[in-house]
Amino acid sequence: MKTIKTIIAAALFLFGAQAIADEGTVRVLMTTSQGEISIDLYLDKAPVTAANFLQLVENGDMDGGSFYRVVTYENDRGSPKIEVIQGGLGDASEGFEAIEHESTEQTGILHTDGVISMARGAVGTASTEFFICIGDQPGLDYGQPRNADGLGFAAFGKVVSGMDIVRKIQGLPADGPTESDYTKGQILTQPVSIGRVRRAD
């Protein structure tokens, strides 16, 4: 009986994953205090990561989040240096379930200009925090040295409108408090609020 239940559960999971992938690309609109950003989520290419973000959107969990960190070639202390803006729920992210890591090798979504990807510490710890690439950032892809484990970050979509807003956010003053020398000069003095994120279709 237990085996049958396991088979049924696995079948339902696969059916759900296929249903998500069948949606292909879903566009979401992110309204911030600096302007609007439109993002395409690639559910067919990154079904786990994109579906997680879409679920956060549909649940209203991303509403009230913020962009709080900006990384430039001048203030970055990693190697290779990158340029991104990071956002999400920040301290409010506790309690959200982490997701499986989908590498760029699996999805084929590379970290090019405008690509949105999940921030993480160890593999399999990503949940609500994300970043948007400014310019091409190949050092964030699978097999590259930016992350010590070599697995890169999980890209899952791309900005299709509003990169001017992304760059505007990156240029804001960043002398906010931080407990880490690594992020000194990267924390926005005034975080950019995310008022609402919703499906555009």
Regions found by a protein language model. Name each.
Residues 16-201:
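Cyclophilin-like peptidyl-prolyl cis-trans isomerases
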Residues 1-8:
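Bacterial N-terminal signal peptides that target proteins for export
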Residues 8-14:
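Hydrophobic helical h-region of N-terminal Sec-dependent signal peptides
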